[in-house]
């Protein structure tokens, strides 16, 4: 099951009783702030996990169509590492 930002804002609306517009604004602001922080430094949310940008180096590869060697450009990847508490919670609910 996929949880969208819209579903999260509806959950906030039902729990807190705020308007739909305010809940959407809160969710969008939280996610945009998480992304902005994660772009420049490691972001750790206690009992949830951490977000970190990792730089992948340029590396050699092969063009599948022509079989010729190519250089794959360097790029940044956003990584999420779940906390031990989140892992335990997920594993507990799977049993």
From Swiss-Prot:
Keyword DNA-binding set for record: yes
Record's GO cellular component terms: cytosol
A Pfam family that the UniProt record links to this protein: Bac_DNA_binding
Statement: the UniProt record of this protein carries the keyword DNA-binding: yes
Name of the protein: Histone-like DNA-binding protein
Family: Belongs to the bacterial histone-like protein family.
Record's keyword terms, sorted: DNA-binding
Gene Ontology MF annotations: DNA binding; structural constituent of chromatin
Species, as recorded: Rickettsia typhi (strain ATCC VR-144 / Wilmington)
Source organism phylogeny: Bacteria, Pseudomonadati, Pseudomonadota, Alphaproteobacteria, Rickettsiales
């Amino acid at each position: 099951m996929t949880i969208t930002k819209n579903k999260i804002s509806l959950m906030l609306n039902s729990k807190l009783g705020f308007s739909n517009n305010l809940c959407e604004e809160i969710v969008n602001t939280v996610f945009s702030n998480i992304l902005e922080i994660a772009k420049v430094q490691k972001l750790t949310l206690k009992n949830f996990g951490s977000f970190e940008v990792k730089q992948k180096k340029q590396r050699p590869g092969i063009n599948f169509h022509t079989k010729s060697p190519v250089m794959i450009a360097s790029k940044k990847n956003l990584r999420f590492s779940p906390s031990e508490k989140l892992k335990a919670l997920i594993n507990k609910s799977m049993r």
